[in-house]
Amino acid sequence: MDAVTVNNFFLIGAVLVGMSILVSSLSSRLGIPILVIFLAVGMIAGNDGVGGIVFDNYPMAYLVGNLALAVILLDGGLRTRVSSFRVALWPALSLATLGVLVTTGLTGIAAAWLFDLHWMEGLLIGAIVGSTDAAAVFSLLGGKGLNERVTATLEIESGSNDPMAVFLTVTLIEMLASGQTGLSWGFALHLVQQFGLGALLGLGGGWLLLQLINRMHLAGGLYPLLVISGGLLVFALANAVGGSGILAIYLCGLLLGNRPIRSRHGILHMLDGMAWLAQIGMFLVLGLLVTPHDLWPIALPALALALWMILVARPLSVLIGLIPFRAFHDREKAFIAWVGLRGAVPIILAVFPLMAGLPNAQLFFNVAFFIVLVSLLVQGTSLPWAARLLRVVVPPDPAPISRAGLEIHPTSEWELFVYHLNKEKWCIGAALRELKMPGGTRIAALFRGTELLHPSGSTILEADDILCVIGHEHDLPALGKLFSQAPDRGLGARFFGDFVLEGDAQLSAVASLYGLKLDGIDGEQALGRFIAHEIGGEAVIGDQVEWNGLTWTVAALEGNRIRKVGVKFPEGRPGPGLFL
């Protein structure tokens, strides 16, 4: 490779990445998932597009795809709160195993019939597109304000279902290549090995990496690089010994993100940029890899298969996978079924048959690519609409306009929160001493216009003041009630109900106040405890229960305890305006 070729490579790469970033603003304007934009840029620059770039290096695409996916999963694990496992671990694992099997089987049967393939080749297509994609899920669910049970289930599922899809794909390729037509006990053993070794190496490697980071004294910019290199080492080791590298690096990130770690905010800041670069690079390469004119001959059967998977296979897999978990409402199940987003993973898995030289391998790749495109365009584009229709959106928590980490000591979790006080805030005109600040928080600075003031207890807050507060992440809900942009009160009233009651209120008192019948229910118990029992599992904000013709909504939690409950009356039946 001469100097001119290298320079052209840099030139083309920079132009494509830059174009992807610049046109990404179209995503929100057009309501199209940003991943589709990146994929489209690659296709436009490819063989059939205006760029005319010929790229058919499948091993290179496999390398780029795996590297990018590893970085995205590491970043996703770092940002996943382990508290979300409280409500979603077992349901997500059920969907990641049983759900993938059901989706693979149903999609495989349809694929074999639509494309006139052997049943094992049909199952191979089903396995390739059987898992939801972490990159797509993390990208499209971020900032949508979905309730915790739905968000956590989808994110954990997408981070843990790839091992099953990879295992099924590799096993079916080996069987097709060797002419084998039956399954053996080694099938189940290999699956246990994938999950077991992946989990062991992910958690073990994450713990060792955590100890190393907290004991090393390095330049600040080197800690994120150490996390990335350590995560990739865990990913590669797990793959080398027969485990799931994808699961391993996700769990490695999960452990690092939920423990005190040196330079936390620097690590998260850099990983955010690296994850974006990984998504752009991966979808650009996959867009370059496909030849659009090859998709037209299979468009109709591939569209039928995509719709079968979206409307039949995925909903049935969710319905079966969530049978043991009664805490899920039908509307939550429906939303989870709809958000079975496919992304880069199926396209990467579709490269496996090409590298193995299987007959019909190009067909498998084209079908997988078409299904991913339909999934992102149909499911991804309609996600906000589906969330509102199925009522899984909860009013957003108020948030500071910016936040930054304070590295006071190696594993410091102190942060600086910045709040803008507009004229609608109730605290305007109040003295600082009148504010009920959460314990352990301090107002560090106050800006008025361009002037820095020294805040004291007698300082009167004015409109457009900027407050800088030092605290911890768990202080954000309380601080939000004081300073942050006020949430839409109309939205809150529509969602949580006409009145909000204390969860500790005695059920008999609530029944007496609203004229409700207990019908043998223990009236001495707290309202929150009764609602939790009716939900049937771990409660999340936004959970709803119908009782005595009224809608009761979980409005606030304190740990696992329901702290506040909203009550909504039928139209035309107002209730007493009393807060218990």
UniProtKB/Swiss-Prot annotation:
SUPFAM superfamilies: FAD-binding/transporter-associated domain-like, TrkA C-terminal domain-like. GO terms for molecular function: flavin adenine dinucleotide binding; potassium:proton antiporter activity. Gene3D superfamilies: 1.20.1530.20, 3.30.465.10, Regulator of K+ conductance, C-terminal domain (3.30.70.1450). It catalyses: K(+)(in) + H(+)(out) = K(+)(out) + H(+)(in). Pfam families: CorC_HlyC, Na_H_Exchanger, TrkA_C. Signal peptide: none annotated. The chain crosses the membrane at residues 3-23, 34-54, 58-78, 95-115, 122-142, 163-183, 189-209, 218-238, 241-261, 270-290, 303-323, 335-355, 363-383. Keywords: Antiport, Cell inner membrane, Cell membrane, Ion transport, Membrane, Potassium, Potassium transport, Transmembrane, Transmembrane helix, Transport. It is a multi-pass membrane protein. The keyword Repressor does not apply. The keyword Ion transport applies. GO terms for biological process: cell volume homeostasis; intracellular potassium ion homeostasis. One of its GO terms (cellular component) is plasma membrane. Residues 403-485 form the RCK C-terminal domain. It is found in: Cell inner membrane. Belongs to the monovalent cation:proton antiporter 1 (CPA1) transporter (TC 2.A.36) family. NhaP2 subfamily. K(+)/H(+) antiporter that extrudes potassium in exchange for external protons and maintains the internal concentration of potassium under toxic levels. This is K(+)/H(+) antiporter NhaP2. It comes from Pseudomonas aeruginosa (strain ATCC 15692 / DSM 22644 / CIP 104116 / JCM 14847 / LMG 12228 / 1C / PRS 101 / PAO1). The gene is nhaP2.
